[in-house]
Amino acid sequence: MEGRAEYRIVYPILARPVVTMGEFRFVVLNCSERGIRIAQRALPVPLEPGTTVMGQLALAQGEARPFRGRLLRLDSDSWVIELDGESRIPLPVIYQEQRYLRSRFPDWR
């Protein structure tokens, strides 16, 4: 649980989900019920913390979910998006994703 209030999945490189926002695709580094961290990629328009973003999250197990949230933080190598209430990932979906990853990557923790 990493001392957090919610369970977080840190993805193995070969199973990272993808976020699509318009014509741009980003790799997901980790996710929880309330947020996702994506690998940074330069955009033609600079984004600032607090910016509303929306798109599609394709989980490793194949489920695709639309999302809306706000850019919480920009780091040198990643962005953190806080998901809006209706876009949050239900805990059963997080557990299903975890089971999927464990079945495909037995050494993954």
Describe each model-derived feature in a short phrase.
Residues 14-21, 50-64:
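Short conserved beta-strand and strand-loop elements enriched in small hydrophobics
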Residues 43-51:
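Surface-exposed connector loops and short turns at secondary-structure junctions
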Residues 36-40, 75-86:
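Short, solvent-exposed secondary-structure boundary/capping segments
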Residues 25-28, 65-72:
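Short beta-strand-centered aromatic/proline hotspots
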Residues 82-91, 96-97:
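Conserved RNA-binding domains used in RNP assembly and mRNA/RNA metabolism
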Residues 1-33, 39-44, 95-109:
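N-terminal helix initiation/capping motif
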Residues 13, 42, 59, 85-87:
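Non-catalytic surface loops within mature trypsin-like serine protease
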Residues 31, 73-76:
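Generic beta-strand structural signal
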